[in-house]
Amino acid sequence: MNSFVSTVLLLSVTIALVSGYPSQLQTTCVTKAKSCTMFFLNGVYCTECTYSGTLELKIGSTCTFSIYEKKVASQPNENSQNEVAQCKQSSCYSNQYVPVDCAAAFGNEYITYIENQ
């Protein structure tokens, strides 16, 4: 009976240790940039800044590439996409992008990282 308990205990510890290891390798690469232009419009100085970023996420053999862009203007006009982020995503091995929800593609942590410049 004692050897049975030892065997069960050894198997339980082995399963717990193995389950703690990731089954697939995950790598992440994030870039960010900010560019601003200043201009004079109707007697007022205005600025327009573009926040952009990319996220390459590889999990095992699956790889996605996401692009984030957000324009912020000091004097928005009715046609601007002010404060609305635009995101698109593709496979790392393709250049055919589809629009995606930014929160789904990047997550709040990476969006905050890109916008805090």
Swiss-Prot record:
Chief localisation class: secreted
Pfam families tied to this protein: DUF1505
Protein name, UniProt field: UPF0375 protein Y45F10C.2
Superkingdom classification of source: Eukaryota
Protein function: Negatively regulates the egg-laying rate by promoting retention of fertilized eggs.
GO cellular component: extracellular region
Protein's cellular compartments: Secreted
Organism: Caenorhabditis elegans
InterPro entries: DUF1505 (IPR009981)
Family membership noted in the UniProt record: Belongs to the UPF0375 family.
Keywords: Secreted, Signal
Signal peptide: 1-20
Tissues expressed in: Expressed in the uterine epithelium.
